[in-house]
Amino acid sequence: MPEDGGGDSGDVPEIIPDGEPLREEQRPLKQSLGSSLCRESHWKCLLLTLLIHACGAVVAWCRLATVPRLVLGPEAALARGGGGPPPTYPASPCSDGYLYIPLAFVSLLYLLYLAECWHCHVRSCQAPRTDASTVLALIRRLQQAPPCVWWKATSYHYVRRTRQITRYRNGDAYTTTQVYHERADSRTARGEFDYSAHGVRDVSKELVGLADHAATRLRFTKCFSFGSAEAEASYLTQRARFFSANEGLDDYLEAREGMHLKDVDFRESLMVFADPRSPPWYARAWVFWLVSAATLSWPLRVVAAYGTAHVHYQVEKLFGASSPPPGAVPSGPPLSRVATVDFTELEWHICSNRQLVPSYSEAVVMGAGSGAYLRGCQRCRRSVSSNSLPPARPSGPRLPFSRSRLSLGAGGRATPGVFRSLSGGPLGRRGEDTEPLESPPCYEDALYFPVLIVHGDSGCQGDGQGAL
């Protein structure tokens, strides 16, 4: 795993462990001033700063501004009696104690401002700080880590319980019974996606240019995709089988799913510096608190956001990387569809393709001459179930379509009635000569009780005319 070719990577192409060519490059992006403001507006800090400065302006106005006030007393009465203007004197507009109102607001807002600055500092310290070489080594481990797509199903129900609580009314304490419901987990199952038959490889990008910026905020996410339809169908089938196997075991089912990388410490956010021992001036703690004490924290945050580059690195795993060769024959049966994975009987009919039901139009146009239609296939037989014919007033509920198809597939005692036998045997020809042709059945009879063609296990061995 060579990592010492940082500056000469353009001369010798790098080969990743899979033996594939160089990955697509991804570089950190330094945002403009407007985009950095939209990304991290810090509107709480801005609002508190504006309110503090507004209250400070009111206090300064109360201390510096003067307004004329009338003189109260005998001098004012003598002046009004002589016909002259009333005597006034300059005074502060907040001289009667109104100065304490904006001072109280300033003190309260300043405390809120310091609390908001403390929360901002804590959030910034939550992201670990590291250098570019450590991040590149971490990315290499993330690329080489095998993925694990997991599912978790928790079956639970609620239990009704009671407890004694003490309440107070009019100074008197009394005990009452409270009824509440508590969740009780009965069973927890976990499963993983088995991708050994399809293979997996990492298709993440190659991160370059971290050392070109003084500070870079790195955000990690992980995802997976499919390189073939077989891998996607296998994932959906395993997922559906897992949750269907754990469904119905209790009153409720909590389903969770996700992905993690094995044998690696995945972090969602990192702060990368070119030299962690001497970070830029706007990223130092003492500068932050010194500027925050002067109520200039918001401009400092804008400068820090503008000087920090951002990059969103996505670790992507591709399932289905090792697809079988074009001439290879699949070893197992085709994958079942997820939409009908719970309908075992329907899936069996679709996969085996043993019963072919003619439509109503095909059943009407079938005549006696169509007996040669089935002579080419010696393994096909046509059967009519006289026991399944509908009575005049059906007394019970109608069977499901799949069950009715199975009942009609078994050969019963054929009686002349709605459907004519087309087996081509002597009994069938004698019946045609002696009995008149009857009218076709009604639509519901033909829909619910069709005439079926049942094939053998090996299928038709004729010239392909047995397909209906």
UniProtKB/Swiss-Prot annotation:
InterPro entries: Tmem151
Regions crossing the membrane: 45-65, 98-118
Gene Ontology terms: cellular component: endoplasmic reticulum; membrane
Keyword set, alphabetical order: Membrane, Transmembrane, Transmembrane helix
Subcellular location field: Membrane
Disordered: region residues: 1-25, 384-438
Membrane topology of the entry: Multi-pass membrane protein
Family per record: Belongs to the TMEM151 family.
Name of the protein: Transmembrane protein 151B
Gene: TMEM151B
